Curated annotation (Swiss-Prot):
Lineage, highest ranks first: Bacteria, Pseudomonadati, Pseudomonadota, Gammaproteobacteria, Enterobacterales
One of the GO BP terms on file: ribosome biogenesis
One Pfam family this sequence matches: KH_dom-like
Domain EngA-type G per the UniProt entry, residue ranges: 3-166, 208-381
Residue positions binding GTP 1: 9-16, 56-60, 118-121
Stated role: GTPase that plays an essential role in the late steps of ribosome biogenesis.
Keyword hit for Mitochondrion: no
Gene: der
Name under which the protein is recorded: GTPase Der
PANTHER family per the UniProt record, alphabetical: GTPASE DER
Keywords for this protein: GTP-binding, Nucleotide-binding, Repeat, Ribosome biogenesis
The species this protein was found in: Pectobacterium carotovorum subsp. carotovorum (strain PC1)
């Protein structure tokens, strides 16, 4: 399960600045849900190859009324959902009564909490953080989020211990070693592709994890019940690693599925109303754990910014996608045409996803969903050999040559598979990281057409060897030095 990190503190202590600093590693804010939790932001961060979900809980006003009553219900649940809480304070403003109130609340929750003193740039960190030790939160980590100072140390000390995978240090290679590594990697990948037929892994043997997500009241629960009702299976709760989600096994056409329900299919006595409404964290985790995501959209309300934010998170997660437009029944032909035009306009950038128009209430169109689900899963888990990927890369290069970079043509050497669900193509070559985005999109679309991929995004990664002589000046040989000396002497005599 991807760890969840909540940023907590008074207003204007720099939580949003740190949030942007962390999520910028993925080049954007991943998701923004103004309709569910006002002025809250949710994003994905990557620290040395490990992913985290970052939650900006907004400002908490701990006044004389007490933090317990002044804190928004959604923020309370965000803290409960978090694996780590970064409690941020303002080093320039010093210790405030609100900080003490928030600290008291956090201590009562017994959460893993790290005290972060922001805005220490230009100040003596030891001096400005001394007062905060009285909060009893342990070590104080001074940072300057706006400049990034101290953030790396904070991440390495606080976040990385939550992941167990060891990170290998990069090894510098000489030019000969780099060339040998290219051919060795190519040979190894070709050998691996030949052994694929003997590989014990078969995606068909595993159940397809299907997450049903969307805004409130778009019909997620109705669709879940319709799917289960049609199949007449015994529904039981199977607890999983993603908290606050219910895993429901089912069988359809002799194919096993696991529905990940994010609509709160639980006993009402075990949850509070606030927890029930706060579905952001469990939705994000359900997406991460799923193989295929059904994004449900209300045909009567159209596509909202919240739908696009959720869609952006799905795409960045690399999950297969099927778009479901619900409540299609009862709409006039004119309204249906308008809805389709809006979908084409706002969802034109995801032309790889199938769109289904259904009525979960009456069941029309629901049965056809599973054709697209199985197609998307098959495309996402299909094994493709190194020889095939390299041949497609060469065909794409022949049809449209890579551009010149600093006067030299970018050279694509070979390609191989780097992962599945989503499919990842790794292209090796010289200066490949300098390719413009337009050519990268061209390669991605070329692979999609050539492999006939539907329902899942394709990711392309570029790798190149470092030139060990890039920063070294050429040294003259003894003969060249003598020749240079004679030329300089001749020039001086001529003057």
């Amino acid at each position: 399960m991807i760890p969840v990190v909540a940023l907590v503190g008074r207003p204007n202590v720099g939580k949003s600045t740190l949030f942007n600093r962390l999520t910028r590693t993925r080049d954007a804010l991943v998701a923004d849900f103004p309709g569910l939790t006002r002025d809250r932001k949710y994003g994905r961060a990557e620290v040395e190859g490990h992913e985290f979900i970052i939650v900006d809980t907004g400002g908490i006003d701990g006044t004389e009324d007490g933090v317990e009553t002044r804190m928004a219900g959604q923020s309370l649940v965000a803290i409960e959902e978090a694996d780590i809480v970064l409690f941020m304070v303002d080093a320039r403003a010093g210790l405030m009564p609100a900080d003490e109130g928030i600290a008291k609340h956090l201590r009562s929750r017994e959460k893993t909490t790290v005290l972060v003193a922001n805005k220490t740039d230009g100040l003596d960190p030891d001096m400005v953080t001394a007062d905060f030790y009285s909060l009893g939160m342990g070590e104080v980590y001074p940072i300057a989020a706006s400049h990034g100072r101290g953030v790396t140390s904070l991440l390495e000390t606080v976040l990385l211990p939550f992941v167990q995978d060891e990170i290998e240090e990069p090894v510098e290679l000489s030019e000969e070693e780099e060339n040998a590594a290219y051919w060795a990697a190519l040979e190894a990948d070709e050998q691996a592709s030949e052994e694929e037929a003997e590989d014990d892994f078969n995606p068909e043997d595993l159940p397809i994890k299907l997450a049903i997500v969307g805004r409130p009241n778009v019909g997620k629960s109705t669709l879940t019940n319709r799917i289960l009702g049609e199949e007449r299976v015994v529904v039981f709760d199977m607890p999983g690693t993603t908290r606050d989600s219910i895993y429901i096994p089912m069988v359809r056409d002799e194919r096993e599925y696991v529905l990940i329900d994010t609509a709160g299919v639980r006993k009402r006595g075990k949850v509070t109303e606030t927890v029930e409404k706060f579905s952001v964290i469990k939705t994000l985790q359900a997406i991460e754990d799923a193989n295929v995501v059904l994004l449900v959209i209300d045909a009567r309300e159209g596509i909202s910014d919240q739908d696009l934010s959720l869609l952006g998170f799905i795409l960045n997660s690399g999950r297969s996608l099927v778009i479901v437009v619900n409540k299609w029944d009862g709409l006039s032909q004119e309204v249906r045409e308008q809805v389709k035009e809006t979908l084409d306009l706002r969802l034109g950038f995801i032309d790889f996803a199938r769109i289904h128009f259904i009525s979960a209430l009456h069941g029309s169109g629901v049965g056809n969903l599973f054709e697209s689900v199985t197609e998307a899963y098959a495309c996402a888990t299909r094994r493709v050999s190194t020889a095939m990927l390299t041949r497609i890369m060469q065909m794409a290069s022949d049809d449209h040559q890579p551009p010149l970079v600093r006067g030299r043509r970018v050279k694509l050497k070979y390609a191989h598979a780097g992962g599945y669900n989503p499919p990842i193509v790794v292209i090796h070559g010289n200066q490949v990281k300098d390719l413009p985005d337009s050519y990268k999109r061209y390669l991605m679309n070329y692979y999609r057409r050539s492999l006939d991929v539907m329902g899942t995004p394709i990711r392309i990664q570029f790798k190149e060897g470092e030139n060990p002589f890039a920063d070294k000046r050429n040294t003259l040989t003894p003969n060249q030095l003598r020749k240079r000396k004679r030329l300089m002497s001749h020039i001086k005599k001529g003057k």
